[in-house]
Amino acid sequence: MNKYLSILSLALVIMFIAAATSIAQHEGEKLSTEELASQIGRSESELKEIDNKIIVYNETIKSNPEDADAHFNLGILYEKKMKFKDAISEYQQAVNLKPDFIDAHINLALVYTERNMFGESINELKQVLEIDPQNVAAHKYIGRSYYKTGMLEDALVEFKKALEIESNDPELYCYLESVYFSMGRLDEAAAELKKAIEIDPQFKVAHLNLGFVYYEQGKLDEAMEEYEIAIGIDPKFADAYSNMGLVYCQKKMFDDAIAILKKAIEINPSLPDAHNNLGFAYWNKGLQDKDNNADENGNEWKKKAMREVTIYKGLIGAK
C-alpha cells in the first residue's frame, strides 16, 4: 500500500491489482474508445483487438454455453474494457459451471473489491480457501478487504496467515505494514517494511512507505533518504518527489519544496497530491516572505497556491 503525503488528504492506495480505484468507478461502456484507451493506458488498436476476441468468445459460448474457460476468458476481456458488470456475470457463470475454478473465484473477488463490494469479495475468497486452504492470494485479498472496511485485527490475521505460507513475498509485508500504520504502531510498521526491502532492495513502494513512516515519526532526514533511494530505483517516481516536497516544507525549505514538487507534476500532471502539496508550499512561501519583510510577491504566492488547490480538487472530483 502506498502512502502519499498531502496537507488536505492522505491517500492510501493499494497498487497491486489491475485497475486503479478512479478507473473502477466508471463503466467502460460510458466512455468513447478514445477516452477508454486513455483511461486504461491502451491504444485504440489494442481495444479493437480485445473487441474481436470478445466476439470470438461469445461465438464459442453460443455453441457451447457450458464452456467454463470461455466464460472466464470473456470475463477477463470485459474487465480489460472496464465492463465490470459483464465481467462479473461471466466469472459467475464460470464458477457455477466449475465450482472449483480457483482463478475465476479470485478474479470475481477482485472485481467485487474494485466495486467496493467487500462482503461479496470475502465470501468468494472463502470459497477458494475451502478448495485450497493454503491459497496465499485468497488470504491476502481477504485481508485487503478487511483492511478497507476498517477490520484491522481481522486483516492482520489474514496477512499473517499468508506470510506463514509464503514468507518471501515483499508485498505481503507492505500490506502488514499498512495495518500496523493504521493502528498507530509505527515501529512495527517500519520493521515490516525493512523486511520487504531485505527481500527486494529494489522495491520502490516499500522505500516510499518507509519514508512516510519516518516522516510521521519526525525522522525527516531518514524519510528523505528513503525517498532518494526510491527515486534512484525509478527516476520517474512522481509520488516520491511529491512526498519529498513535504519534507522540505516541514524543514521550511520552501524554494526546494516548490522545485521538487514541480518535478513531480512534470512527471505526472495528474497526481492530485503533488498539486495540493505545491499549493501548500506556495502558500507557506508567501507567509515566509511576509515574516522576512519580503512580501512584495505575497499575493502572487497566494494566487499560485489557490490555483494548485483548484487543480487538486478537479483531479479528485471535489466541487
Show which residues each predicted segment covers.
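N-terminal leader/linker segments that initiate helical-solenoid repeat arrays
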Residues: T21-D69, N73, M82
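Helix-start (N-cap) detector for alpha-helical repeat units in TPR-like alpha-solenoids
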Residues: A68-D69, I102-D103, V136-A137, P170-E171, ...
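Terminal, low-structured helical/coil segments at or just beyond the last alpha-helical repeat
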Residues: E27-R42, K48, N276-K319
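Bacterial N-terminal signal peptides
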Residues: S9-I17
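Structural signature of tandem alpha-helical TPR/SEL1-like repeats
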Residues: S45-E59, K81-Q93, E114-Q127, A137, ...
